[in-house]
Design a protein with these regions (language model features):
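Short, surface-exposed basic-aromatic patches at helix termini and helix-loop junctions that form
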Residues: 21
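Extended, alpha-helix-rich binding/interface surfaces that flank or overlap catalytic cores
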Residues: 1-2, 16-18, 28-188
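Short N-terminal binding/cap micro-motifs at the start of the first secondary-structure element
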Residues: 10-16
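Structural motif
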Residues: 4-9
């Protein structure tokens, strides 16, 4: 896995390198000027995820000065499916004062809703830049260990065919219907699978 980080992300670069070492990961972290986004995650020469990192103050400022609309427009034109473009929003809205901008917490909530619902981007909230760095590394760890390398919207994605009896837990009694009860009962017998 390769993590490409924009050269302007000085603190994040230091944290990623430190945590990469502390956790015993061996991800290739490179620093370069990214035309779009702040972090790009690659595997074997293919870009998997593009992440746009924003503190609440950054988000508020970008709404005020128009960068938010321009940036989301450019992200929408990226070759990755919007679901694989992730806004990482750092901070606690409950303690956001917005004293440096005219943006109120309610506007931040509706903007985050818009990012997901109307624009189709993914969004993750983190407490601070340290949690952001850990999140990025944990995502890379999961992707590197996963047998399914392709995300849902990737052209090579093949969904696994499972029937209900393969995924139901015995305690989910309210999910039992006359149509699936036979498979569920049989799958409870040792040595018998639902296949």
């Amino acid at each position: 896995m390769q993590i490409k980080v924009d050269i302007r992300e000085h603190t994040l670069i230091k944290l990623l390198n430190a945590l990469n070492n502390d956790y015993g990961f061996n991800f290739d972290i490179s620093v370069e000027r990214l035309d779009l986004g702040d972090i790009s995650i690659w595997n074997e020469g293919e870009e998997l995820l593009l992440l746009e990192r924003k503190s609440l103050n950054d988000l508020a400022s970008s709404i005020t000065d128009g960068r938010y609309a321009e940036q989301s427009y450019r992200l929408n034109g990226h070759s990755l499916h919007n679901h694989n473009i992730v806004y990482l929003i750092e901070g606690n809205i409950s303690t956001f004062s917005g004293k440096w901008s005219k943006i109120k917490p309610g506007t931040l909530y509706t903007t985050m809703f818009s990012i997901q619902y109307f624009k189709g981007f993914s969004m993750i909230r983190t407490f601070d830049i340290t949690e952001t760095a850990e999140y990025i590394l944990r995502v890379c760890d999961k992707l590197s260990r996963s047998s399914e390398k392709f995300g849902f919207y990737h052209e090579s994605f093949q969904p696994k065919k499972k029937n209900y009896a393969q995924v139901v837990h015995a305690e989910k009694k309210k999910n039992i219907t006359p149509e699936n009860i036979g498979g569920i009962i049989l799958s409870q017998i040792p040595g018998i699978s639902s296949k």
